[in-house]
């Protein structure tokens, strides 16, 4: 079994890529709401989304069903060690 330091966290890699590349996303919540915008930051429990009208939204990950990027995201395991916020 891999150690926790060597484990690849696909969720963090995905969120970091869409954040760094300013890829617009649609966040589908478990209650059916859709939120569109840019990922500005994230941690273990939350995602900060900047909506199209520049409003910042703090979304708890347990409320998220799906995140759909507007364009394909290239995954790179080396991105997991980069910092999460600019």
UniProtKB/Swiss-Prot annotation:
Sequence ranges assigned to domain Sm in this UniProt record: 12-73
Top-level taxon of the source organism: Bacteria
One CC-aspect GO term: cytosol
Record bears the keyword RNA-binding: yes
Swiss-Prot/TrEMBL keywords: RNA-binding, Stress response
InterPro entries named among the record's database cross-references: Hfq, LSM_dom_sf, Sm
HAMAP family documented for this protein: Hfq
Protein's recorded name: RNA-binding protein Hfq
Native source organism of the sequence: Thermoanaerobacter pseudethanolicus (strain ATCC 33223 / 39E)
Lineage, opening ranks: Bacteria, Bacillati, Bacillota, Clostridia, Thermoanaerobacterales
